Curated annotation (Swiss-Prot):
EC number annotated for this UniProt entry: 3.6.1.1
Family named by the database record: Belongs to the PPase family.
Superkingdom assignment: Eukaryota
Complex and partners: Monomer.
UniProt catalytic activity: diphosphate + H2O = 2 phosphate + H(+)
Assigned keywords, A-Z: Hydrolase
Organism listed in the record: Euglena gracilis
GO MF annotation terms: inorganic diphosphate phosphatase activity
Group of enzyme by EC: hydrolase
Protein name, as recorded: Inorganic pyrophosphatase
Residues spanning the membrane: none
Top-level taxonomy: Eukaryota, Discoba, Euglenozoa, Euglenida, Spirocuta
Coiled coil: none
């Protein structure tokens, strides 16, 4: 399960 959470985490780390 790494579709929305992965994008959210990447945007948050940006």
């Amino acid at each position: 399960m790494d579709t929305k959470l992965g994008l959210v985490e990447e945007e948050a780390a940006n």
